[in-house]
């Protein structure tokens, strides 16, 4: 870190898990006990695909989900430590996480490329127009009105034109990549281009093989192609690299808070 000219952070689900955001543990079971009893859901991820029979049930669940994962948690200690660790270094973040933790911890929104969306936004269900709608006000409005795992019909969210909405989470080809998404994609590429022949430090946190083409494989290619680049991989389960020609590589399988603190 001390020697690096640029720092590029790549973060997957393992980082938020290491930070203590547990989407299947006791906290989840307490907050979602009505849904667990009624629908048999077991965790926040798989319950996202539950086939609710009515829109009132579906959006009651999503209001609770969004609040639990996006608005209730403050910036975790681990994310704040990462921000302090980077300090004043020229840096950028690419992440598949959708929980907003980087921005909460003090990273500039202009330096974050959240490729897979953000819990904080709705989009048109059809994918058109390419616009997003912030949902915090809606969540705060409907949460107190959930009864029997339903919301009032009149509070089902819609676009300003009255059309159906979906979460802005990448799950199929209707995912909306709006103007901000494309600006951040360009900023990410520009950062890589200016750092490629300098001392670039790649910090990869908790990235597995769910979507390796977004962070894991590109980071390995950069480490192999850019001679002054060092890849540091923090991954308990998959610390190895598969790309040949990487000159500078370190991996850590220990608990991430322990590594950062030391």
Region annotations inferred by a language model:
Residues 1-262:
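Conserved catalytic alpha/beta core of Sir2/sirtuin-type deacylases, generalized to analogous enzyme cores
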